Amino acid sequence: MASSAGLALCAQTLVVRGGSRFLAFSTTGSDDDCVFTYDCSTAEKKATPEDKGEDGQPADTGSDSILASTFSKSGRYFALTDDSKRLILFRTKPWQCLSVRMVVRRCTALTFTASEDRVLVADKSGDVYSFSVLEPDGCGRLELGHLSMLLDVAVSPDDQFVLTADRDEKIRVSWAAAPHSIESFCLGHTEFVSRILVVPSHPELLLSSSGDGTLRLWEYRSGRQLQCCDLAGLQEPGEQPGHKGLAASRIAFWGQESYVVLLCECVPVVFVFQLDASRQQLVFRQRLTFPHRVWDVVFEEARGLWVLQDCRDAPLVLWRPVGGEWQAAPDGAVSPRLCSHLRESWAMLEGSVGTDDSFRSLYKATFDNMTSYLKKKEERLQQQLKKKRQRSPFPGSPEQTKKACPGQSALSC
């Protein structure tokens, strides 16, 4: 899966990442001059046994691109994983790198526990490892494993359950204290599960998105599906039909009015829903359209929806609800210095310009067996006919004439 530019936010601290670098600053504008910058290419690299190829020589060490990042619940800690198979942990007040630790495989997602004592990382081989926050140099511990690639991991707000989403359409709910003990499976998706989110204000509910182009609501402890929203049915006339390209790269929740937004990588659209908790249903509200590709979105509780887009002049925009409709905030709502920092650091975002859909390779390959069978049958019949013609002489050929001569002479006698 390719790395793309992304956002992470906690309280008023916003992180913008791209390539191997990230910038961290305040969204208020009062601390715009206090910008923390980090480049993973400068981080310590340690060789592991998995880094050696079959011939014993060092294998590809990676590009240092950031694959995933997240804040802890309080915002006190920030963690990221990169393409060089490292987990890097930071303290945010003040910003300081606490540790650089190696992971076994390249990671696809990570999250902090609610107690902020551990970081859970999910990797491409289907395993989840936990790393201590309180012991920054401690090694990772294997917690659980799937038989296929993991695409997301989440923890319930009470730290009782670990939820994992994989390429084989499954969402597993495991007990955190004994991850081998499975509480339930949430089954129903027909393609890979790209993202999951436990609803913060309703911790018994789970949102999930998939390559099948649906957004689903679950009561995850029982594995019961409450609702399935087909995103293809929300497209405008003339847009490309079908579910491919509607796998969400981000599900975000805004606690103020229970808004849920869904960002899909292949369309410059953000779908807006509202959660009706009393009915346990999602209500579709609006489609936000953009003239540029949207890389990521994230909610700030006090202000609205931040949107990171492929536009050098306005890389970061803010959207707010006005009279029940989401609208782009005036230019003055986004600090000029904040946008200036991003324009000056545009080189770190350029690597995400024009990148392909990172989920494209995850779709199941489909085969039309009947068409293939009929085609092969036709080819076989044509070959048989060709061989038959080669064995049989054509009418009027010398061989045909010779065979006819004895009969003719007998009649003449």
Curated annotation (Swiss-Prot):
Q: What Gene Ontology terms describe what this protein does at the molecular function level?
A: enzyme activator activity
Q: Which residues carry this modification: N-acetylalanine?
A: 2
Record note on disruption phenotype? Embryonic lethality at E9.5-10.5, possibly caused by DNA damage.
Which N-terminal residues, if any, form the signal peptide?
none
Region (Disordered), start-end ranges: 380-413
GO annotation terms (biological process): DNA damage response; tRNA (guanine-N7)-methylation; tRNA modification
Coiled-coil intervals, chain numbering:
none
InterPro entries this protein is in?
Answer: Trm82 (IPR028884), WD40/YVTN_repeat-like_dom_sf (IPR015943), WD40_repeat_dom_sf (IPR036322), WD40_rpt (IPR001680)
Function, as annotated, reads:
Non-catalytic component of the METTL1-WDR4 methyltransferase complex required for the formation of N(7)-methylguanine in a subset of RNA species, such as tRNAs, mRNAs and microRNAs (miRNAs). In the METTL1-WDR4 methyltransferase complex, WDR4 acts as a scaffold for tRNA-binding. Required for the formation of N(7)-methylguanine at position 46 (m7G46) in a large subset of tRNAs that contain the 5'-RAGGU-3' motif within the variable loop. M7G46 interacts with C13-G22 in the D-loop to stabilize tRNA tertiary structure and protect tRNAs from decay.
Record keyword Repeat present: yes
UniProt keyword list: Acetylation, Chromosome, DNA damage, Nucleus, Phosphoprotein, Repeat, tRNA processing, WD repeat
Q: Outline the WD repeats, range by range.
A: 61-100, 102-141, 145-185, 188-228, 289-329
Q: Which residues carry this modification: Phosphoserine?
A: 392, 412
HAMAP family, per the entry: TRM82 (MF_03056)
**Pathway noted in the entry:** tRNA modification; N(7)-methylguanine-tRNA biosynthesis
Q: PROSITE patterns recorded for this chain? A: WD_REPEATS_2 (PS50082), WD_REPEATS_REGION (PS50294)
Protein name listed in UniProt: tRNA (guanine-N(7)-)-methyltransferase non-catalytic subunit WDR4
Q: What family does this belong to?
A: Belongs to the WD repeat TRM82 family.
List the SMART domains hit by this protein, alphabetically: WD40
Question: How does this chain assemble?
Answer: Non-catalytic component of the METTL1-WDR4 complex, composed of METTL1 and WDR4. Interacts with FEN1; the interaction is direct.
